[in-house]
Amino acid sequence: MSDPASWISERSQCFDSSGIRKVFDLAAKLENPVNLSIGQPDFDVPDSVKQACVEAIQQGKNAYSPSQGIGSLRSELQARVDKRFEHEDREVFVSSGTSGGLVLTVLSLVNPGDEVIIFDPYFVMYVPLVQLVGGVPVLVDTYPDFRIDLDKVESVITDKTKLILFNSPGNPTGIAASKEEVQGLAQLAADKNIALLSDEIYSQFVYDDQAYTPADYNPNTIVIDGFSKSHAMTGWRVGWVHGPSEVIQTMIKLQQYSFVCAPQPAQWAGLAALDVEMTQYQADYRRKRDLLVEGLKDDFEFTEPGGAFYLFPKVPSGTGTEFVTKAIEKDLLIIPGSIFSSQDTHVRISYAAPDATIEKGVEILKGLARG
């Protein structure tokens, strides 16, 4: 009798399934949860974007597109990137979501044994992705305020360091890096000849300052962006990546043998999305941020987030996992911080939810904090 379990590759056994998915599975079993666990907007895709997709389907634009993306979308993105950065060697292509862009970037750059610097806490995908390609994740602790200490970064750089993974505004912390942090990191990467990948999927959700990108200070920065968060298109799988042409051409080559292309109808929708004004949605999320912060500031210790749609407070006692267990007993869904970190002291709370849900969540959280 054959044993299918013996067929599983070692690389796929070095990490577990996403803990976030486990929480989502649990949510499906609760009748009416107060759900502050979701990492996607609670508004819908704009109507004009939906209509552009429908029209593309009806017009028969349903086949493969070029791997680098449909010409009109790629040209528009390239024009915007050129105007913004004025780099001679910055090229753009359309990826199958920002996650697809992350996969292709790491596949293009990281050899087995290469070290990749990741700031802790981190987006849940980063560490497993580096492990999947045989790289070595090197975590840089940013607790308690989740700011980048360049001395810490420099202290872990070795002759094996290949890549720095940077995310601002960050998931799970919501922290938007300052100009000084971004500029310093960009310069350090340039001085050390280390690739720098900037995950900017939340760049449209910055509330108190502006979104700073290391590409302004290091022309070899690779930038990942997309429509998933800004236009609530998480299920449409359209992102884009821009960076040095040699890297981008390698990623396009790998896309030909993996994702092939982003879904063509969704690319036409993405083209329409570029012309949709989204500032009201962003203002609404700033208000939701303030609602959550005001509700929890007397009972929890946290650094106020400047972007994205997450709060990452320290739990009053015990571990983050224990606190989440107690929250679930009250029908509240939040995410334990250990999913995003080597530490189990915090929880991630999403305010991408209706105001009434946020208010219910605040009351439950305050009750748990006060015992």
Named regions from a protein language model:
Residues G60, K83-E86:
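Glycine-centered secondary-structure boundary/capping sites
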Residues M1-E10, C14-F15, L26-L30, V34, ...:
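PLP-dependent class I/II
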Residues S75-V81:
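Short, well-ordered amphipathic alpha-helices
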Residues V34-D42, E55-S75:
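A glycine-/small-polar-enriched, mobile loop at the entrance of the PLP active site in fold-type I
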